[in-house]
Regions:
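Non-catalytic interaction/regulatory modules that flank or connect domains
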Residues: 141-261
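Ankyrin repeat A-helix N-terminal signature
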Residues: 20-26, 53-60, 89-95, 122-128
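Ankyrin repeat boundary/linker residues
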Residues: 11, 44, 78-80, 113
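Leucine-rich solenoid repeat scaffolds
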Residues: 108-139
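Start-of-repeat signature of ankyrin repeats
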Residues: 14, 47, 81-83, 116
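Ankyrin-repeat junction/capping positions
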Residues: 8, 41, 75-77, 110
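Ankyrin repeat structural motif
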Residues: 26-35, 59-69, 95-104, 128-136
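Ankyrin-repeat C-terminal turn/loop position
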Residues: 38, 72, 106-108, 140
Length: 261
């Protein structure tokens, strides 16, 4: 007990010592070693950097914050099963504040780990609704309530209010193992904003999107999913709200919009 940083450093490298101090939650010592030139990306035998370790424990939030401020790589990748980036690890453990910290600091939410899962996939599997909505709101081109029409077309013409249902939808980029590949968009449909598992995912790059007739009082967007041969008809959450439908149509066409979450 009471060892100075100098005496401890003689026994191990500064880089490894920084890792150990991060685990211990010693923020001041981590800052001191950083100022002395310690490398932030030292990797332990399991492939974890100091930031990855800090993102696995809610008690190390301040350590994670300092490491990021000092320049730690928020997208450091740990190979192997159940691994990935700091964001994957924070999501897996349900650390909502750490997830928000990473996203606001430039963490890439579209990276897939060796299990071919994005951080959003992990959040859905874990059933964490707050983190699912947080990630979607960060990466989305559009998100919000909509109406979905269903049933025979002739019935909708007579009583559309009886053949529509409220849904929660998001237009988001598909995850990728290669950040250099062009983004492909998906329209994700949930029964409600409290559901973590999508009811439907439409690959928009493999769909026909028909521009709404905005001259109609209550226009609708028609999407035909080529892969499932299914047609979807969507309208704004509030009847006659053409602006929201404009946002949805533009988002499906690849133009980012304001995310309403």
């Amino acid at each position: 007990m009471g060892q100075s940083l100098d005496s401890m450093t003689q026994k191990q490298s500064k880089d490894e010592l920084l890792y150990q101090l991060a685990i211990a939650g010693n923020v001041d010592a981590v800052k001191a070693l950083c100022s002395e030139g310690a490398i932030l990306e030292w990797i332990d035998r399991d492939g974890k950097t100091p930031l990855i370790v800090a993102c696995m424990d809610s008690g190390l939030y301040n350590v994670a914050k300092v490491l990021i401020e000092m320049g730690a790589n928020v997208n450091a990748y740990r190979p192997g099963r159940h691994a990935g980036t700091p964001l994957h690890h924070a999501v897996k453990r349900g650390l909502e504040q750490t997830v928000k910290l990473l996203l606001s600091s430039g963490a890439n939410a579209l990276v897939r780990n060796d299990d071919c899962q994005t951080a959003l996939d992990v959040a859905r599997i874990k059933g964490n609704i707050n983190i699912v909505r947080t990630i979607e709101s960060h990466i989305c081109y559009f998100t919000g309530w909509l109406r979905e029409f269903y049933g025979p077309g002739f019935l909708r013409a007579f009583a559309p209010q009886f053949l529509s249902r409220k849904i929660w939808a998001a237009v988001i980029p598909q995850g990728s193992s290669n950040p250099m590949t062009p983004k492909k968009l998906e329209l994700v449909i949930y029964p409600s904003s409290q559901d973590v598992q999508p009811r439907t995912i439409i690959a928009l790059w493999n769909a026909e999107i028909e521009e709404p007739n905005f001259n109609r009082p209550d226009p609708e967007l028609t999407i035909f999913d080529q892969s499932t041969k299914t047609q979807y008809k969507l309208a704004s959450a509030n009847e006659g709200d053409k602006q929201q439908l404009h946002w949805l149509y533009d988002a499906c066409s690849g133009i980012p919009q304001v995310c309403w979450f």
